[in-house]
């Protein structure tokens, strides 16, 4: 019979006791009672916060949105196909946040800031909360710097300033995305960081936008956040906040940023889906009661910061889709009331070949001429009024048998003004060329031309002005004023081009 070696056992026990590392941690644990349709109901998790991240046993993450007396409603940040009833869930003690850094420029990412462009991982040392508080009133200053879109109709009559929120609204297939992407293309060389957020779009549409950015060299200063139509509702709901967090990172580093939300109608629909599955009471159009807060807390993050915070800015261009031109629906009226103006895109104008199809009469910018350079104010001051009078006269002329000479001249001038506002896609114009174009139309130099000739003449005029009168561009860009010398140079160029054009015909 073997004898017990007491001293050896004693030695082993002593070593084990010395090696024992006492770790006591309290974890907030719950159990899944129901899962499906992107929603999980959990019992337990007694100390959880609203909006806190949770982690399921198989690795999926979720956000706590409904805190009820008997259970917690979690929205899943993934398909959750492997989550089983009865499995454990752990609260992380953290609110949703994403990594942020300069390395995100030129990349395509999802709502969790993970790259989806196949170009490898993104290294980031800092992080920001996906939902952070908007700058206070004291932290802001009024909008005073223009953000040029490159579109004559907008920059001359519905100007957008850095730090403004301007809604782009219209039916489907009226060119809303084209207006937004052209604005991004026009920021090349302007030291503006752009963030394009695609919510619930077709993957082919997003790929087309990214290809355009690459071809035009815009990806160097742009981040694309994309959640496609087949993404979970939770990620479509989060995508705009992720984009805003990235834009804020640059804004608080004294940079100017532009963010496009394409489009907020899809985000509202994703939020409605989540809310109905969480059994929240539905309101108007089955949206939950806090759908206004969904958009207001997002758009209020756009701001022009004061000098103490570095005068950075975040300009937001949210897009909202209407059904058959109904701007009195719930989501359009909500976003109109939050933003500092709106650009209406009309299906009738689009089908009539007027592109961008901007209805200048009912579009408005509440910042107004504060967001224009002096030269643009001098030249384009009355153009919106002239176009409004033309539209009124045109409606009257349909029923009038004979018009007096003054009315006929006004109609002819209005048609030419409307023609000069036409621009092809991905062809934004610098502000100096816009000023030359508007001056030519409003001063009557186009009256002698046929309407079909207007755009050809203007293209040639802009090229002629650039080649033979480079001083014109220098005067406008340096002084921001339409001086007498600039006017003389422009008049000379117009006269020369009119003579050349008449000889060509």
Swiss-Prot record:
The positions making up the signal sequence are none
Q: From the UniProt record, list the reaction(s) this protein catalyses.
A: ATP + H2O + 4 H(+)(in) = ADP + phosphate + 5 H(+)(out)
Detail which positions bind ATP.
170-177
Print the keywords alphabetically: ATP synthesis, ATP-binding, CF(1), Chloroplast, Hydrogen ion transport, Ion transport, Membrane, Nucleotide-binding, Plastid, Thylakoid, Translocase, Transport
The task this protein performs is described as: Produces ATP from ADP in the presence of a proton gradient across the membrane. The alpha chain is a regulatory subunit.
Q: How does it assemble?
A: F-type ATPases have 2 components, CF(1) - the catalytic core - and CF(0) - the membrane proton channel. CF(1) has five subunits: alpha(3), beta(3), gamma(1), delta(1), epsilon(1). CF(0) has four main subunits: a, b, b' and c.
The protein here is known as ATP synthase subunit alpha, chloroplastic
What's the source species for this entry?
A: Agrostis stolonifera (Creeping bentgrass)
- Organism lineage string: Eukaryota, Viridiplantae, Streptophyta, Embryophyta, Tracheophyta
- Tell me the name of the encoding gene: atpA
